């Protein structure tokens, strides 16, 4: 329902809400940072390759600094020694930020059920999308990126998720 202004302006001006415009831009300009520690890190290279063309989703520029990234892809096993490093990388990312847990090891510890391995990175940082598999297919990772895009289109532009999440390192 318009205010009646649209009929007088014609096609020369488009009206929208600020949330919609900002979220549209965010959803098509995701800047991923891969935290690859095992086989899934190698599989992520296939996702970033030409065959799967991740650039059509606006995520082709892989960053190597957390301050330049807004999508963290954790691919592989995380040990308890690596947990504070992963937490620090997540905290250095600017808002809004999203996390994909890629592979069985990142999602649930994989077959490493021992005292040195974190049984899922959701014990450390909040996770937006889980991609199962050992290693997962590149199509599954692309599907997770598309779901992150949908989340980016619907989120409020003034949300801070760091303050509302408590992992085992915060205790």
Curated annotation (Swiss-Prot):
Name of a matching Pfam family: Oxidored_q6
InterPro entries, alphabetized: NADH_UbQ_OxRdtase-like_20kDa (IPR006137), NADH_UQ_OxRdtase_20Kd_su (IPR006138)
Record EC number: 7.1.1.-
GO molecular function, one term: quinone binding
Catalytically driven reaction(s): a quinone + NADH + 5 H(+)(in) = a quinol + NAD(+) + 4 H(+)(out)
Cofactor note: Binds 1 [4Fe-4S] cluster.
Superkingdom, taxonomy of origin: Bacteria
Positions of [4Fe-4S] cluster binding: 39-40, 105, 134
Cofactors demanded by this protein: [4Fe-4S] cluster
Localisation per UniProt entry: Cell inner membrane
HAMAP family: NDH1_NuoB
Subunit structure: NDH-1 is composed of 14 different subunits. Subunits NuoB, C, D, E, F, and G constitute the peripheral sector of the complex.
Family recorded in the similarity comment: Belongs to the complex I 20 kDa subunit family.
Name of the protein in question: NADH-quinone oxidoreductase subunit B
Natural source organism: Aliarcobacter butzleri (strain RM4018) (Arcobacter butzleri)
């Amino acid at each position: 329902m318009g205010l009646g202004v649209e009929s007088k302006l014609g096609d020369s001006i488009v009206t929208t809400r600020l949330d919609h415009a900002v979220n549209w831009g965010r959803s098509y300009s995701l800047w991923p940072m891969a935290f690859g520690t095992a086989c899934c890190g190698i599989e992520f290279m296939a996702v970033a390759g030409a065959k799967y063309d991740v650039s059509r989703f606006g995520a082709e520029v892989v960053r190597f600094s957390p301050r330049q990234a807004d999508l963290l892809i954790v691919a592989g096993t995380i040990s308890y020694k690596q947990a504070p490093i992963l937490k620090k990388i997540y905290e250095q990312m600017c808002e809004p930020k999203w996390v994909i847990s890629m592979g069985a090891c990142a999602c649930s510890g994989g077959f490493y059920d021992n005292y040195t391995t974190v049984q899922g990175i959701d014990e450390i940082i909040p996770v937006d999308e889980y991609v199962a598999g050992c290693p997962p297919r590149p199509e599954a990772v692309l599907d997770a990126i598309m779901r992150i895009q949908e989340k980016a289109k619907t989120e409020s532009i003034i949300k801070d998720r760091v303050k509302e999440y408590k992992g085992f390192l915060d205790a």
